[in-house]
């Protein structure tokens, strides 16, 4: 490895020129000669920073509107040259060794997102020279320091000054450089796959033959699903959407656990569906209670009182601003792991600070941005599907029984159907007045999910005559209808589609139960 005091030449070629003048000034202070391409060189010259333009060094002009400028043997030789091995050939062809390369790429992703359908404009922002410089520099990391993130510059220049720019630091920068080029190629590839499907008039762009995803670590977690499992939380690069757990800001509380994040995501995605003030309480991957009301306090109290036993140690999410009264009520009522809100009042913050262990996540404005792909890892494989969207197609619903639903029953059917989608299959949800009354989740047979919901109702001594039942999938037998009727259910919403649908409808008619077929299933495994 070359000594740090032999670092003499730096090549700068950046599309994003923010802070590049300050960077160049520090290199000059360290008596490092600068080489640069046209646009970057002009900015440096305007700021009275001495710089040699690449075209002056190579004796070959930038051509084709700047598309060809750094791809030259004197540049690539200066980067790929190994000083202990290639000195003679470099001297023969007057190749200057390049010790530092600072590069960032054309903003392909930004242009793609703004002008997705302007293919010529998007393609014109595919960087060719930049990735070539970076890959060459990273390959020759023993001789070249490569910087693709200016946040790394100050620590690098400090290491050079302190003569501590060791092999580990060089290798780490090279590793980061390859991550940068890999992600850049990935988003270009994905764009071409999408556009190729348009040319072919096919609908396969969502599921290409080869698929890659790029995530960055947001934080290490306390542990995984269990104490003996280590875990970390990774998020998508360059996210701009608010209103997700991935983009939420934790304003207080202990470090999040794997289960905290998983349950919080379910709670938040569920509560997003509602426009009126709503509260969702989640435990072990399932909503244990959900309520919608005219204000946040009433929605919380209704949700909590729906199943106070299960709410203990739960995750609570709201779709509206948390006020001081509701915050105080929560800490008076129960032990809670996480509270998720789009915004919070200053007084509510002070109240929750009395319980410093409570994790509080502020998401910003909520929006239904859960679109695209849903992934599930299996051993040596990955299952990929479209996300089960929140949209309800009322026009496809059918009233299949002799009695049609009342206005209240229809309102409760919509509410229960929205909740059922987030409950593990087999899922049964009882609700009335937009409050869940009993939830049967995760049983291997639908009848036992129904019985579980009945047990919860009976244990709490609730009178649920006139309540609504939602089932995430069809009823294979009439026993579920009879069981629901035994506690007073008056309306049922389900997908339909069983070979015994006629028998199921007759059973509902026998009990004077109104039934809606949605023609859409919501299994959740």
From Swiss-Prot:
Pathway listed: Purine metabolism; IMP biosynthesis via de novo pathway; 5-formamido-1-(5-phospho-D-ribosyl)imidazole-4-carboxamide from 5-amino-1-(5-phospho-D-ribosyl)imidazole-4-carboxamide (10-formyl THF route): step 1/1; Purine metabolism; IMP biosynthesis via de novo pathway; IMP from 5-formamido-1-(5-phospho-D-ribosyl)imidazole-4-carboxamide: step 1/1
Chemical reaction(s) catalysed: (6R)-10-formyltetrahydrofolate + 5-amino-1-(5-phospho-beta-D-ribosyl)imidazole-4-carboxamide = 5-formamido-1-(5-phospho-D-ribosyl)imidazole-4-carboxamide + (6S)-5,6,7,8-tetrahydrofolate; IMP + H2O = 5-formamido-1-(5-phospho-D-ribosyl)imidazole-4-carboxamide
InterPro entries per UniProt: AICAR_Tfase_dup_dom_sf (IPR024051), Cytidine_deaminase-like (IPR016193), MGS-like_dom (IPR011607), MGS-like_dom_sf (IPR036914), PurH-like (IPR002695)
GO cellular component labels: cytosol
Biological process, per Gene Ontology: 'de novo' IMP biosynthetic process
Any one Gene Ontology molecular-function term assigned to this protein's record: phosphoribosylaminoimidazolecarboxamide formyltransferase activity
Entry's family note: Belongs to the PurH family.
Full protein name: Bifunctional purine biosynthesis protein PurH
Organism listed in the record: Buchnera aphidicola subsp. Acyrthosiphon pisum (strain APS)
Lineage, uppermost ranks: Bacteria, Pseudomonadati, Pseudomonadota, Gammaproteobacteria, Enterobacterales
């Amino acid at each position: 490895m070359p000594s740090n005091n032999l670092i003499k030449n730096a090549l700068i070629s950046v599309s994003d020129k923010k802070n590049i003048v300050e960077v160049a000034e520090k290199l000059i202070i360290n008596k490092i000669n600068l080489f640069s391409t046209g646009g970057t060189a002009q900015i440096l010259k305007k700021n009275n920073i001495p710089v040699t333009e690449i075209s002056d060094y190579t004796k070959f002009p930038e051509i084709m509107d700047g598309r060809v400028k750094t791809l030259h043997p004197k540049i690539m030789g200066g980067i790929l040259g190994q000083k202990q091995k290639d000195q003679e050939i470099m001297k023969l062809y007057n190749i200057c060794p390049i010790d530092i390369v600072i590069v960032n790429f054309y903003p392909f992703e930004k242009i793609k997102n703004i002008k997705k359908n302007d293919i010529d404009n998007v393609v014109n922002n595919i960087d060719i020279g930049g990735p070539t410089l970076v890959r060459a520099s990273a390959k020759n990391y023993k001789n070249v320091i490569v910087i693709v993130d200016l946040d790394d510059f100050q620590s690098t220049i400090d290491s050079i000054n302190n003569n501590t720019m060791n092999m580990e630091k060089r290798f780490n920068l090279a590793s980061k450089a390859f991550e940068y080029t890999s992600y850049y190629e990935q988003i270009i590839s994905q764009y071409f796959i999408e556009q190729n499907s348009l040319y072919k008039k096919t609908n396969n762009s969502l599921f290409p033959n080869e698929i890659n995803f790029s995530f960055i670590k947001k934080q290490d977690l306390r542990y995984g699903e269990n104490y003996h499992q280590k875990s970390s939380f990774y998020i998508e690069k360059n996210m701009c959407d608010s209103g997700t757990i991935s983009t939420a800001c934790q304003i207080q509380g202990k470090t999040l656990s794997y289960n905290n994040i998983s349950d919080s995501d379910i709670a938040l995605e569920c509560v997003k569906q509602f426009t009126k003030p709503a509260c969702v309480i989640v435990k072990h991957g399932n909503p244990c209670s959900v309520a919608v009301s005219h204000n946040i306090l009433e929605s919380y109290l209704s949700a909590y009182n729906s199943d106070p036993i299960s709410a203990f140690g739960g995750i609570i999410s709201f779709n509206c601003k948390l006020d001081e009264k509701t915050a105080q009520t929560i800490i008076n009522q129960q032990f809670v792991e996480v509270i998720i809100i789009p915004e919070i009042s200053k007084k509510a913050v002070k109240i929750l600070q009395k319980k410093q262990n409570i994790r509080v996540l502020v998401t910003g404005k909520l929006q239904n941005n859960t679109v695209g792909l849903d992934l599930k890892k299996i051993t040596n494989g990955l299952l990929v599907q479209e996300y089960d969207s929140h949209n309800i197609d009322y026009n496809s619903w059918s009233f299949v029984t002799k009695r049609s639903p009342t206005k209240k029953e229809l309102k409760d059917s919509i509410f229960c159907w929205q909740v059922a989608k987030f409950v593990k299959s087999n899922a049964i949800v009882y609700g009335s007045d937009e409050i869940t009354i009993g939830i049967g989740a995760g049983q291997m047979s639908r009848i036992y999910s129904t019985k579980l919901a009945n047990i919860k109702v009976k244990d709490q001594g609730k009178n649920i005559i006139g309540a609504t039942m939602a089932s995430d999938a069809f009823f294979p037998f009439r026993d579920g209808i009879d069981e629901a009727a035994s506690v007073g259910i008056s309306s049922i919403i389900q997908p339909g589609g069983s070979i015994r649908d006629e028998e199921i409808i007759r059973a509902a008619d026998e009990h004077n139960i109104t039934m809606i077929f949605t023609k859409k299933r919501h299994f959740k495994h």
